[in-house]
Amino acid sequence: MNSIGMMIDVSHVSDDTFFDIVKISNKPIIASHSSPRVLTPGFERNLSDEMIELIAKTNGVILINFGSSFVNSKSNKIFTDINDDVEKWRVEKKLKSDDKEVEEYRDQLINKLNPFADIEDVLDAIDHVYNLVGDDYIGFGSDYDGLGNTLPKNLKDVSTYINLIEGLIKRAYSKESIEKICYKNFFRAWNANLQNHQI
């Protein structure tokens, strides 16, 4: 992948695969939609502090996932319970996973339990990476196209990005840091992967 200018994304890979990639790659790697594991203990889809530090050492970027289950341990537990309940109900009703009734039942449980994280949890995720490795290795991964009805309050779609920027300003992030987080860090990693390659 390095040899053809293809960026390597470690979101969704196992820990073993992650460490293999870090050993082999000679270009910046990214986690396109992951958050710090320390915020959601036991949720291995997120990144350990060691992984975050190793991505930074490649000059890569950790693009923060906004999903409630990715940034808040209580939300993670509730959504796990909801998914388990929905699957049990689906089997009992002999329905397919993509049947409309299944989604309606899931929405009923979500509306009842209100398991959503808050935008502050996303800002905490950004703070954690910042405190660990600095502002050169953070970006927004959102995962708007993959999360469905699990996004935090005040961060439901791209029109609410301004809330995130305002949150960063309130937490005393500089204009330069915010620009890095919004786009400059990702562009740097992208361009480093494309260096010496024609597209």
Give the residues covered by each predicted segment.
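Mid-to-C-terminal alpha-helical segments outside catalytic/metal-binding sites
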Residues: 156-199
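C-terminal helical cap
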Residues: 101-127, 176-190
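Aromatic-lined glycan-binding groove of carbohydrate-active enzymes
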Residues: 48-104
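Active-site environment of divalent metal-dependent phosphoester hydrolases
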Residues: 13-19, 36-39, 69-72, 146-148
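Short acidic/histidine-rich active-site segments
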Residues: 64-69, 133-155
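Conserved, mostly hydrophobic/aromatic
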Residues: 8, 31-33, 62, 143, ...
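Histidine/acidic residue-rich metal-binding segments in metalloenzymes
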Residues: 1-30, 44-60, 121-136
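Acidic, His- and aromatic-enriched active-site or binding-groove loops in soluble protein domains
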Residues: 28-38
